[in-house]
Amino acid sequence: MAQKEGLPAGRLSAMVIDEDKCHADSTSYMLSAELNFSVTVFTSPIKALDFLQNHAEGVDLVLADVHMEEMNGFDFLKVARELHKSIQVIMMSTETTMYTMKRCVKLGAQFLVNKPLDAGTIKNLWQYVDLKVLRMEKIKDLLQGIGDESTCANETNSLAENPKNDTKKKYYLMWTPHLQKKFLHALQILGKDASPKNIKKIMGVDNIDCRQIAAHLQKHRLRLTKDLKKASFTTDTSKDESNSRIGPAESHHVCRNASTLQPRSNTQPTETTMQILSEDAEYDDVYAAMRRALQYGIVFDESKHSSDPSGDEDEQVVVGGDQDGCANEANDIDSSGDHHQVAAVVTKPCNANASQEIINKMTNSDGMQATKGSKAAVFRLVDYSESDSD
């Protein structure tokens, strides 16, 4: 009979425990025919346990029924596993429920199959058998009795003394925070001249070699380069966002006026403003004084209203009365017959044209216009020569 593919070489032994004699015999026949098993049948679970107690190492597979009157199948499974821990048991039941399946597996069974067994189940039954355990059992049987204890001890000692036969174990170094701190300290000291050999000397750690330091140094530099690129990308992105928020016109205006936005002293603008205001006020005061002098017939002293201390103090404008020099008289007769006489006398120098120009300016500033039904102002320039007598 051809050997079943997947089964170990040699004939395996099996036990079938079932109180149903017909089903036990049919199962035994199919195991022998399909899988080439050497099968032993028991209709009493207690007798089967007595057999296992003396021949447990020679049994490779056990098929036991769950529902038996003499002894429950779960109790049989528990005792069988205690007698031989490596024995493989497959339970059979007419009710393959989830509860029954979980309980069988929990007690150490390989699988739960539906009863009665058919040819298809028997053909696939070997898939639930741990063939590795079966092979190890066969190897132990073959090695048993070969050589004495002294021979085995000598071979073991020779293997231990020869280091070439031992496989060298590889281990990985974990960079703890303490090692990382020493590594960064060494980099800070060495700077650009950092090499794995110099780093190892400064770190002073025995259980580390230059190759591991070189690998960690390369990773450290790659990490720094990556962080630098990420930081530059973040900065560029923030600048683009700020420019998009400001707008092209506003950003151009900000760039153009960035150099001019500098703090300046407030002293010079304040002084300039005060000076302009004082000059305007003084200018208004001069013309206001001239208008009052013409209105009330008093003497207008220009030196009192002059802002230049080095000005000519001899020039005066005299309003009213008879004075020497050039005189201008204005006579106005209104409808009521009242007479108004205004005379402006300018001394030093005595110039008729200059006097006429001054009078014209004063009349224009007062807004005097000849209108119908109102007072008409008439100005006449009188030139008195020195030869004429009063």
Curated annotation (Swiss-Prot):
Compositional bias of kind Polar residues: 257-271
Q: PTM 4-aspartylphosphate: at which residues?
A: 65
Has UniProt tagged this entry with the keyword DNA-binding? yes
**Reported consequences of knocking out the gene:** Dwarf, narrow leaf, lesion mimic, low tillering and late heading phenotypes.
Domain (Response regulatory) ranges: 13-130
Which gene underlies this protein?
Answer: RR29
Q: What Gene Ontology cellular-component terms does the record carry?
A: cytosol; nucleus
Q: Pfam families of this UniProt entry?
A: Response_reg (PF00072)
The record's annotation in PANTHER family points to: TWO-COMPONENT RESPONSE REGULATOR, TWO-COMPONENT RESPONSE REGULATOR ORR28
- Residue ranges forming the DNA-binding region read 169-226
Protein function: Transcriptional activator that binds specific DNA sequence. Functions as a response regulator involved in His-to-Asp phosphorelay signal transduction system. Phosphorylation of the Asp residue in the receiver domain activates the ability of the protein to promote the transcription of target genes. May directly activate some type-A response regulators in response to cytokinins. Functions as a response regulator in response to cytokinins.
**Keywords attached to this entry:** Activator, Cytokinin signaling pathway, Cytoplasm, DNA-binding, Nucleus, Phosphoprotein, Transcription, Transcription regulation, Two-component regulatory system
Q: What is any one GO biological process for this UniProt entry?
A: phosphorelay signal transduction system
The GO terms describing molecular function are: DNA binding
Q: Which family does it belong to?
A: Belongs to the ARR family. Type-B subfamily.
The UniProt entry, under NCBIfam families, shows:
myb_SHAQKYF
Q: What is the name listed in the Swiss-Prot or TrEMBL entry for this protein?
A: Two-component response regulator ORR29
Question: This protein's superkingdom?
Answer: Eukaryota
